Structures are given as C-alpha cells and as structure tokens.
Amino acid sequence: MRALLAHLLLCVLVVSASKGSRELQVPSDCGCLNGGTCMSNKYFSSIHWCNCPKKFGGQHCEIDKSKTCYEGNGHFYRGKASTDTMGRSCLAWNSATVLQQTYHAHRSDALQLGLGKHNYCRNPDNRRRPWCYVQVGLKQRVQECMVHNCADGKKPSSPPEELQFQCGQRTLRPRFKIVGGEFTTIENQPWFAAIYRRHRGGSVTYVCGGSLISPCWVVSATHCFINYPKKEDYIVYLGRSRLNSNTQGEMKFEVENLILHEDYSADTLAHHNDIALLKIRSKEGRCAQPSRTIQTICLPSMYNDPNDPPFGTSCEITGFGKENSTDYLYPEQLKMTVVKLVSHQKCQQPHYYGSEVTTKMLCAADPQWETDSCQGDSGGPLVCSIQGHMTLTGIVSWGRGCALKDKPGVYTRVSRFLPWIHSHTREQNGLAL
C-alpha cells in the first residue's frame, strides 16, 4: 500500500511538471552551443537539457539543421548529411561497431568534434572533406560523404530563362584531386547523358553514357545497343548526378530515333566504327533545354588540321562505370577522372594493342595506370580543352581490363566521324559544329 501511494505521488509530481511549471533555468553547465539555454525540471533539478534555437538540434544544440554544404575541408561542418558518395547510410557515432574505431561519440572531445548520438557526416581528423564510417561487408570503412562544398554551390548570375546553349561551357570548375578518379556532380559535366534500358515488368537498368551534342541529339557507342536495337527500349536522362535517384533539374527523354553505325564490327577485343546517335524528345515533344546542369559539348572543328589535341594532352572521362572490373555494382554517384592521350605509335606496340588500334581510334591512360574508364563507362565522353572550349574528342569504346599497365582505354576518334554525324543530324545551326 505504501509503495502504491509513493508511486501515485511521483505521478502527480510528473504530471504537474508537464503542465507549465516544469522548466527552471539553471547555470549554463550542460554544454549548450549555438545560443542554446541550459534548463532543468522544477522537481528534478539534477536532470538538465538544452533548449535549442529553431534551426539547431541535438543534445547540445550542436547540429545545424539548416546547413546543406560544408566550408573549407568541413572540419566544422555540423549539418545532417548521412550517406556516403555511393548512397550508403552512415553508421551512428555511438553504435557498438563505431565505438571500436578511433573516432566515436564517447571520446572526451566528442562534442568539440561534432560527434554524438547521430550518424551525420563529420571531419574530426581534418581530411579533405566530411566522412563517416560505413558498413561494407564485415568491415567498417571510412567513406567520404554525399555533401558538397559551399564554394561549389554558387548560383549562376543569369536567371534560367536567359540561359542559352554554349557548347563546352560549364558553371563549375572541376577539382581534379571510373577506376580511381573522383566523385563529381553533373554541373562539372553538364553534357553527360545517362542511358537506361526498359525491361518487361517496368524495371530499368543503366546501360551506357552519352554526350549531348545539340538540343535533340546524343552521341554514344554502337556496342551499347547492338544486342537490343529497338529505340523504344531506351530512355535518356540529362542533368543527372546519381544513378538510381533523381537530381533537381534533370530532364527525361524518349528515344525518337536510334542510329547505329552501319559499318560497326567487333573483333575479339576491338570495336570498329563504334559510334551511335540518339535523337531525344520529351513526352511534351521538346528537346533539351539549357540550364546549369544541361549543356551541349562542342564537336571538333571540321576545318582545323590537325583537329585533335596533341598526344600527352590531359583530358577528362566521366561515367557511372564500375570502380574495378571485379565489382558487381555500379557506383551510385557520377565519377570523373583525368587521363592523357597516348600516341598511336605507342598504342600500336605489341605489348599494348598492336594492330587492333586503328586511326579511327584514340588511346588515353593515366601515366601511373591508376585511373581508367571501366565497364559501364561505355559510350561516355572523352573531353579535351581545345581553344578554351571543352570538346568531345573520344567516345569510351573498349580496352583490356581497367587501369592495367600498358593497356590504356581505347576511344572512338570523333574527328574521324564528323561527316557521318552531320549527315544524320543535319544540324546546321552551330550547336553541333
């Protein structure tokens, strides 16, 4: 009976505390940050908590709920990004597996480092950008996070309605730091097209990359479509940074016409005349519209001689291809890396590819053989700067393995196919020239 009365008395105290008389300000000794106020219960003064301003949260008001980007290297980033660059969820800093790592929520300096009872990305050890622990198989790995640098997020000065197609121009300057390479956003490669194939039942899978050469035309590789040549099977996305989720401002297109090169052939390894054209049209009947994330790429000039950059030139490749040839899945985030053009004399040496490489092809590789195009990058762009304009110099075609020594990536040499492109697109307005 006494125990019951004591329990009822405790309930009365708790209820009365919840009816407006529970809060009593105490000295700010509970570590509240960002203007938070340390509070306690009127009847249980040993229980403290932080009353946070509207845009902050967390036990100590240390989480900035309004922060969507990081500054510098992100050491002081306190936002709520919680996935890595492949879309995998971060582990909580107070989870049992993370408590065995160097950085976790139970460290004496956890609050200063932004660590706590959450799984938000942080940079406690001053790496180049925010990161988190991710469960990969049986291991917990440090992975960079899907959050952009504030310096890369500046809005264009011109309103969208004033934008026009200006081939080879982009709003962001890439930071070079596919196999190796760096995750990027579509603003760095706004001409990149992601091509998917429909399956019975409604599912879609990523097939290949492509490049927007005019508002209505995307160029890619014939080998991507040779086994399934029906145009109705394909859809094309422009302005997309992630493989299986939407990007703000992206556009979706049906394929109105699919043109495969009539002289395409494939040997044991090499692909010849590996080029294709896709005429795109939205359900509303429109071609692509220029934006911060959608832009055309320049084609080589038909009147320059030579019309390709010199061997040794650094060029960019972009795609959703596998990071290693043994990987089962494609990465979720778009990747970009830099390779250098390799001379035909070198690429035709016996320990490279010998006679399999023709003058309608280009070779490109990383001098250290650490980065390369790989499975899934096919059809995507090899882009080089020519007279200040990013120019489609090659199309990802074939190669042996990925980033193997003396086995560079081989690309369709776009300059050799300009008459073919123009004869089919009949673009004479300068956008595809």
Swiss-Prot record:
GO cellular component: extracellular space
Disulfide bonds: C30-C38, C32-C50, C52-C61, C69-C150, C90-C132, C121-C145, C167-C298, C208-C224, C216-C287, C315-C384, C347-C363, C374-C402
Activity regulation information from UniProt: Inhibited by SERPINA5. Inhibited by SERPINE1.
TM regions (residue ranges): none
E.C. number: 3.4.21.73
Post-translation changes: Phosphorylation of Ser-157 and Ser-325 abolishes proadhesive ability but does not interfere with receptor binding. Produced as an inactive single-chain protein (pro-uPA or sc-uPA), is processed into the active disulfide-linked two-chain form of PLAU/uPA by a proteolytic event mediated, at least, by TMPRSS4.
Enzymatic reactions: Specific cleavage of Arg-|-Val bond in plasminogen to form plasmin
Alphabetically ordered keywords of this record: Disulfide bond, EGF-like domain, Glycoprotein, Hydrolase, Kringle, Phosphoprotein, Plasminogen activation, Protease, Secreted, Serine protease, Signal, Zymogen
Location in or out of the cell: Secreted
Entry protein name: Urokinase-type plasminogen activator
